[in-house]
Amino acid sequence: VELIDGLLELLERDPDFQSFTLDGQTAALEDYLAIRPHNRARIEKLVRAGRLEIGPWFVLPDAFLPSGEALIRNLRRGLARSRELGANPRDGYMPDSFGHIAQMPLILRGLGLRSFLFMRGLSKEQWERLGCEFRWRASDGSEVTTIYLRDGYLDSAALGHPEQFGDFEGHEPKPELAVERLRASLKAREGKLHSGAAILFNGCDHMPFQPELPRLLAGAQAAMPEVELVHATIAGYIDHVESSGAKLALHEGELLGNEHNPILSSVWSTRTYLKLANHRAQWLLERVAEPLTVAAGARGRELAALLDEAWRLLLLNHPHDDICGCSIDAVHLDDEARFREVEQIATSVADECVRELARKAGVRRDGSTQWLCALRTS
């Protein structure tokens, strides 16, 4: 809450601080507005001006552990929340998930997105062949412009400081260190920037924004006249790539390489109780409760709002550090509680729908006949 408070003040106070990207997800804004509902208009104004970039996801999920339906619901919810606040996201920012499924371009294009930005999943062979920018095609032919974040989403974090993350409060950034970092980032991408532009990220997990960024960029620009430094947005960068006329190589299939950033595949089997609870929760929602609400007609439609809340709770368990079981115990205790709530809601809705269907079928208790109502939902 304090971070977004300060961010709104900075963006309103300093027009030279061009923009801020809020991590590709909207769940944090839901939490913020629950505490600061009076700031909604301020957020909407900055979003519409293109200075606060939000979405497209509700949360940044793992790509393999949630079901395909859950990934779609996640993106749909994030897009809806973004549009409510004045945004129209077109770029699939998913920086830190541990590898990516082959059908991600299909999901993105199906919901109107044009690009995908990622950090983990490129192999050495793919790096040599594809570089930082390429086209990614799903099995149905859907394609997205795809951007590989070679040094992750923190390559320019804590710019001007000796490390990329840490507590630098009270420490003045040094312009020469900013120049050194920027030069190193560009050198690492030599020969791999087909559009002629690199995207670098000034941020990291749990790191505050840098109010002095415009001053650091101005100083670096003076020291690096051979390049043009722009404080930009993801959308602006993708506009440049797609209008550059660069011929981009094509990739088909999963992204599961480990060349610069490991996919940490062992997380797919850590805390297996979470994986089992997730599978059951998804099955109850997708295969049992939702089909029954359709069959139950008007009564089912009355119950649909309960399932929307169940989906919200389930999606809050799908950030990669949650569902992958690689966070602290306190986080996963919350995950367990949400899974229980999802199961309770889904089973209650399913039970009520079965009762409604039995009533419609004329099932009556007459003391001499036992009725068995069997329903196949998947």
Label the predicted regions:
Residues V1-T377:
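Catalytic-domain carbohydrate-binding cleft regions of carbohydrate-active enzymes
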